[in-house]
Design a protein with these regions (language model features):
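Extreme N-terminal basic, low-complexity initiation segments
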Residues: 2-11
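Short linear/disordered segments characteristic of secreted peptide precursors
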Residues: 11-13, 20
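Active-site beta->alpha loop and helix N-cap motifs at the rims of alpha/beta catalytic domains
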Residues: 47-55, 61-190
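Catalytic alpha/beta core domains of metabolic enzymes, predominantly
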Residues: 173, 184-216
Length: 216
């Protein structure tokens, strides 16, 4: 029965000059792209539920390697009590690649029940095999989930066109709101702003991005 703590609610975010430069560059690209490619459809309003601080939940384990549901339950209650705006389950922070399919399903059921509709929920469903990601989305009960968080394909190092085609297939396979996840330090490839904008303008259910490229 290990004690689970999370200091994310107390973390201060400091903006560096590099980050400011990146934001200014992205904003300039957005303005140019919007002018050249006016969007005809409106994004899914689910994105409005995901404003504020979203906490990526870890997966606590016992010494024997099994999931510690008691600790996970305490962690969920802690985040809700400390004013998290929404929860992210089964992301990379949850060590999802190390979980079996049955563990993923059981963890999702547990978090959904424990949350009991108190906060919006985002579920991580991603990978480097497009077909497997789509099959997982279609076979998962998403009735209590507000959006899918899907990471850029890792290890394979796809081209920008390959990244576009990956997310295009996912967006066309579901009506669920999709959050892109760009973390090149982990995946080995950076999704460029132009690719993000292309996807966002062409697919209204792509509603947001978790941008973790930093100084990549």
């Amino acid at each position: 029965n290990s004690k689970v703590t999370n200091k994310a609610a107390n973390t201060k975010i400091h903006t560096t000059n590099t980050e400011k430069h990146y934001s200014q560059k992205l904003f300039a690209i957005c303005k140019r792209y919007d002018k050249a490619n006016p969007k005809k459809t409106q994004p899914d309003m689910t994105a409005n539920k995901l404003i504020g601080m979203g906490i990526a939940l870890i997966t606590p384990f016992k010494h024997d390697g099994s999931v510690d549901y008691e600790a996970l339950g305490k962690l969920i209650e802690y985040q809700i009590a400390n004013h998290a705006d929404y929860l992210v389950m089964l992301g990379t922070t949850a060590e999802t690649p190390t979980l079996t399919a049955s563990e993923r399903n059981e963890i999702a059921r547990f978090i959904i029940a424990k949350n009991n509709k108190r906060l919006p929920l985002v579920m991580g469903i991603g990978g480097n095999d497009t077909r497997t990601v789509i099959e997982q989305i279609k076979s998962t009960d998403l009735s209590h989930v507000d959006a899918i968080l899907s990471v850029v394909p890792y290890y394979n190092k796809p081209s920008q066109e390959g990244i576009y085609q990956h997310y295009r297939a996912i967006a066309q396979a579901t009506n669920m709101p999709i959050i892109l996840y760009n973390v090149p330090g982990r995946t080995g490839v950076n999704m460029k702003a132009e690719t993000v904008l292309r996807l966002a303008h062409e697919f209204p259910n792509i509603v947001a991005i978790k941008e973790a490229s930093g100084n990549f």
